[in-house]
Amino acid sequence: MLDHFGIKCRAPEITVPFYEQCLASLGIVVVRRQPQFKAVTLQRPDMAIRLWIGEGDDAWKASAGVMRLHLAFRADSKEAVDAFYETGMRLGAEDNGPPGFRRPTSYEAFMFDPEGNNIEAIWQTERPFPRT
């Protein structure tokens, strides 16, 4: 289905390290660096799809009426979701929903990245979580 997706950013010196650090808690690591584009490619070793993040140009700049991205990254545990969110908050992300149970089978956290994209970490199970 998908091979990769890309995020072009206005401030790669902020956005690239932000993603590197936040996604590390989800097992997503840098597999390639492209200094000429101020870019990295990230991937989770057990998944084929890759994420490219790098410097944008005038053709990619957002304008009025352009919708930002919503990206959801799979987590393997509640603790990984918490670490993703805590790292983002420490790096200055804007909160868009703290870690918590959103549905009976999912634990999620949301934030806006430095470019204004809504990013999410989600841990899902087949059975409902016990409520306390």
Enumerate the predicted regions with their spans.
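Short, charged/polar surface micro-motifs in flexible loops or helix N-caps
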Residues: 45-49, 59, 77-79
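Beta-hairpin (beta-strand-turn-beta-strand) motif
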Residues: 56, 74-76, 114, 124
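Core segments of cupin and vicinal oxygen chelate
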Residues: 8-50
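Short beta-strand/turn micro-motifs at beta-sheet edges
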Residues: 55-61
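Broad, structure-driven detector of short, well-ordered beta-strand segments within folded domains
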Residues: 49-53, 121
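Vicinal oxygen chelate
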Residues: 2-11, 62-132
